[in-house]
From Swiss-Prot:
Residues of the ABC transporter domain: 2-236
Topology term for the membrane: Multi-pass membrane protein
InterPro entries: AAA+_ATPase (IPR003593), ABC3_permease_C (IPR003838), ABC_transporter-like_ATP-bd (IPR003439), ABC_transporter-like_CS (IPR017871), MacB-like_ATP-bd (IPR017911), MacB_PCD (IPR025857), Macrolide_Exporter_MacB (IPR050250), P-loop_NTPase (IPR027417)
Coiled-coil intervals: none
GO terms for MF: ATP binding; ATP hydrolysis activity; transmembrane transporter activity
Protein's recorded name: Macrolide export ATP-binding/permease protein MacB
EC numbers, comma separated: 7.6.2.-
SMART domains in UniProt: AAA
Family classification: Belongs to the ABC transporter superfamily. Macrolide exporter (TC 3.A.1.122) family.
Protein role: Non-canonical ABC transporter that contains transmembrane domains (TMD), which form a pore in the inner membrane, and an ATP-binding domain (NBD), which is responsible for energy generation. Confers resistance against macrolides.
Record field: transmembrane: 265-285, 519-539, 571-591, 604-624
Highest taxon above the source species: Bacteria
Membrane is among the record's keywords: yes
């Protein structure tokens, strides 16, 4: 079963083992005896594949161990070797049953099978009443029996016992030795390390070692051969194995988080703030953008203004005129929903003893709908008003507020105001326009454009033509077509256009840029939180080094250890993300309750993005600590206090 030839182990210039050669047959009960520093524990660690010899040959069950990789050695420990340690090496967060079941988890056995086997083993060792007890609730003898049960969980063809009675009282020590003798009688191969000759005398073969060399090798009787040993087959990673690994990792991660509540919460704080920031920033951006777009919609969506000149501020624009012929040409275009004229002039509005600087806006019937103006009382202009150049006016909110400060809108209908000495009957009052990007204090009277031309300015030319494009038509294509048609009609391009969609796109682009910049701040907060997670995971690896060594000793592969700490990092980040989302929902609710300017809009995609990014942060910042844990040397890890 075990064949060692010329095994040497050097640490620096110190020779721990010197050309050790021995063979152990299956079913033997061997005691390796020697004083402290003799090399007996180093020899046991090499036999148990926890350590690697500096030179020599080691064959276990027809496999040359010195040529196996780390995962193959882990499989050998998992399937054929059981360890019994002097200090028990039970995981403090797990119950007795869970500790015993652990090797079967890494072997890919199902939960029910693991549970039944663990109960049977503990029952055989008279611990049926301690299944759910944690190690700190057990006596030393009971803990050692749990350790023995764990060693037998996957069969334990070879039991390696390192000073198994060293930390026990004499009664418990005798019980442990009796258990080992019974196991040997059943066919298990036992290799026991001790410094006590009385304990060594219980074995059927005693090997004495001193200063790294074998002094004597005494056999008492032939070895038992009751076990039918299996040769190692190629390991397959089944779905059950992966499920068991993941479940165990989640359980350990959850227990670890609960065991250090305050530390875990402080670690999550960075993630919570980062995720809440991401969700709130997106909600704020969506809310403000929706408000602006709504305002633009009320100001007039898909609208195009045509004005004389080559652009805003053109000094020669006064020499250029738009006329009714241009207006009729545009009205004939089928892709335009509405077309109307617009002119204005400044003057003085008077009512009784109140006189104000004001502007008369000469508009048509469609202008109110095109510009998104909403009536508060009365009516808007109709076709008869425009056709007959009637002296009627619709006051805006500023005009009503300044000319009739203490009266309701409906009470001033029918009254007459003067504009540049011309009387105008009030037929309507507009609502306050809260959707303008920039609020102004201009007093406006909306009158028929024909009235403005015929009775106020005498100018038959139009200052502006405003059109509304149909919803199913691209405003950009419509604008290009209008420019081309008017250019052909007028013989030159002596006019310019302003498309409301250009303003809308500029606002949207500006909001997008602002959102991206603010999101960058939130991402930085997430990264800071991720660094906090990495820091605490490094601390966790340092604190749990011994646990890692124990898991490796019972057969955990490096990928099992790595998965465990990665899942723990991801779990911390995910819980932090969920708490961050909950916090953001409260913030959004509070903001929407207290603020009337614009709402914060919770977006499902931002929540999903937050959760996914937190998992990504967990993987990225958990990888380095997890890799450190997976690369630990089992012997160094087990010796860590």
């Amino acid at each position: 079963m075990i064949f060692l030839k010329n095994i040497c182990k050097n640490i620096g210039e110190n020779a721990i083992l010197k050309n050790v050669s021995l063979s152990i047959e299956k079913g033997e009960f061997v005691a390796i005896i020697g004083q402290s520093g003799s090399g007996k524990t180093s020899l046991l660690n090499i036999i148990g594949t926890l350590d690697t010899p500096s030179s020599g040959t080691y064959v276990f069950d027809e496999y040359e161990v010195t040529k196996l990789n780390n995962d193959e050695k882990a499989r050998l420990r998992r399937e054929k070797i059981g360890f019994i340690f002097q200090r028990y090496n039970l995981l403090s967060l797990l119950s007795a049953k869970e500790n015993v079941s652990l090797p079967a988890v890494y072997a890919g056995k199902k939960l029910q099978e693991r549970s039944q086997n663990a109960k049977k083993l503990l029952n055989d060792l008279e611990l049926a009443h301690k299944l759910d007890s944690k190690p700190n609730e057990l006596s030393g003898g009971q803990q050692q029996r749990v350790s023995i049960a764990r060693a037998l969980m996957n069969g334990g063809e070879l039991i390696l016992a390192d000073e198994p009675t060293g930390a026990l009282d004499s009664k418990s020590g005798i019980m442990v030795l009796e258990i080992l003798q019974k196991l040997n009688a059943q066919g298990h191969t036992i290799v026991l390390v001790t410094h006590d000759p009385k304990i060594a005398a219980q074995a059927k073969r005693v090997i004495e070692i001193k200063d790294g060399e074998i002094l004597s090798d005494t056999k008492k009787e032939k070895a038992q051969e009751k076990l039918t040993l299996k040769t190692m087959s190629k390991e397959k990673k089944t779905l059950t194995l992966l499920k068991n690994q993941a479940f165990e990792c989640f359980k350990i991660a959850y227990s670890s988080i609960l065991a250090h509540k305050l530390r875990s919460i402080l670690t999550m704080l960075g993630i919570i703030i980062g995720i809440a920031s991401v969700v709130c920033v997106v909600a704020l951006g969506l809310g403000s953008q929706a408000k602006v777009l709504e305002s633009i919609a009320r100001l007039g969506t898909n609208t195009i203004e045509i004005r004389p000149g080559r652009g805003f501020g053109d000094l020669r624009s006064g020499k250029t005129r738009l006329n009714f012929s241009d207006l009729e040409t545009l009205r004939s275009l089928e892709y335009l929903e509405a077309v109307d004229a617009h002119s204005n002039t400044s003057g003085v509005a008077t009512y009784t003893n109140i006189s104000l600087s004001a502007r008369a806006e000469g508009v048509g019937v469609n202008n109110f709908a095109i510009e998104g103006l909403r009536i508060d009382a009365g009516r808007i202009l109709n076709n008869d008003d425009v056709k007959n150049s009637t002296n009627v006016a619709v006051l805006d909110f500023n005009a009503k507020k300044n000319l009739f400060p203490d009266e309701k809108s409906e009470n001033i209908l029918g009254r007459v105001v003067l504009f540049n000495s011309q009387p105008f009957k009030i037929i309507g009052v507009l609502q306050k326009d809260t959707d303008k990007p920039i609020e102004d204090n201009v007093v406006r009277l909306y009158i028929p454009y024909t009235t403005l031309m015929n009775k106020l300015t005498g100018d038959r030319n139009l200052r502006e033509i405003i059109v509304k494009v149909k919803d199913d038509v691209s405003s950009t294509l419509a604008e290009n077509a209008i420019i081309r048609i008017l250019e052909i009609k007028r013989g030159q391009k002596d006019f310019f256009t302003f498309n409301s969609d250009t303003f809308k796109q500029a606002i949207t682009a500006n909001k997008r840029t602002t959102t991206i910049l603010t999101a960058c701040v939130a991402v930085i907060a997430l990264i800071v939180g991720g660094i906090g997670v990495m820091n605490i995971m490094l601390v966790s690896v340092s604190e749990r080094t011994r646990e890692i060594g124990i898991r490796m000793a019972i057969g955990a592969r490096r990928e099992d250890i790595m998965m465990q700490f990665l899942i723990e990092a991801v779990m911390i980040c995910t819980i932090g993300a969920i708490l961050g989302v909950i916090l953001s929902i409260f913030v959004i609710f509070a903001f929407n309750t207290l603020s009337t300017d614009f709402p914060m809009i919770l977006n499902a995609y931002s929540v999903l993005l937050g959760l996914l990014s937190s998992m990504f942060i967990g993987v990225v910042f958990g990888f380095f600590p997890a890799r450190n844990a997976a690369n630990l040397n089992p012997i160094s890890a087990l010796s860590k206090e």
